Curated annotation (Swiss-Prot):
Family annotation (Gene3D superfamilies): Methylglyoxal synthase-like domain
Source superkingdom: Bacteria
Molecular function as annotated in GO: methylglyoxal synthase activity
UniProt KW Lyase keyword: yes
Residues reported to bind substrate: H19, K23, T45, G46, T47, T48, S65, G66, H98
Chain ranges of the MGS-like domain: 6-152
UniProt entry tagged with the keyword Amino-acid biosynthesis: no
Family statement: Belongs to the methylglyoxal synthase family.
Function: Catalyzes the formation of methylglyoxal from dihydroxyacetone phosphate.
Record EC number: 4.2.3.3
Pfam family name, one: MGS
Entry GO CC: cytosol
Name of the protein: Methylglyoxal synthase
Length: 152
């Protein structure tokens, strides 16, 4: 597949997602980094977003709850280039009924080459990057060329 460049803006659009057993871990991480995160636009699946907003007073664009379609909503935003970073604390020890949605979300984040953290250490590396508050170029699939090739 041919690639093109997308510029992640200095003010990132960040999606926050956490499975039930990981919600407290994500909330603690958000509270620890609240001053930095408040400089960006935040999205989250429903329950996670409402819990974070209630605990911190931060403005969160809450989707539906993950099992009710929220993971797919976040995935759609990634596909549309509207999410720049995904912080997704998923529980590797417990299966969830919407596992296919979880896999699809992670697949789309990989396809569209956005930074993804699935644990605290990686989330810390991302947010502490000297480029976190900078505009950064990434390579993404050239969808227009892909579509043109498919329609030949």
């Amino acid at each position: 597949m041919e690639l093109t460049t997308r510029t992640l803006p200095a003010r990132k659009h960040i999606a926050l997602v956490a499975h039930d057993h990981c919600k407290q871990m994500l909330m603690s991480w958000v509270e620890r980094h609240q001053p930095l995160l408040e400089q960006h636009v935040l999205y989250a699946t429903g329950t996670t977003g409402n819990l974070i907003s209630r605990a911190t007073g931060m403005n969160i664009n809450a989707m539906l709850s993950g099992p009710m379609g929220g993971d797919q909503q976040v995935g759609a935003l990634i596909s549309e280039g509207k999410i720049d970073v995904l912080i997704f604390f998923w529980d590797p020890l417990n299966a969830v009924p919407h596992d296919p949605d979880v896999k699809a979300l992670l697949r789309l984040a990989t396809v569209w080459n956005i930074p993804v953290a699935t644990n605290v250490a990686t989330a810390d590396f991302i947010i502490q990057s000297p480029h976190f508050n900078d505009a950064v170029d990434i390579l993404i699939p050239d969808y227009q060329r892909y579509l043109a090739d498919r329609l030949k």
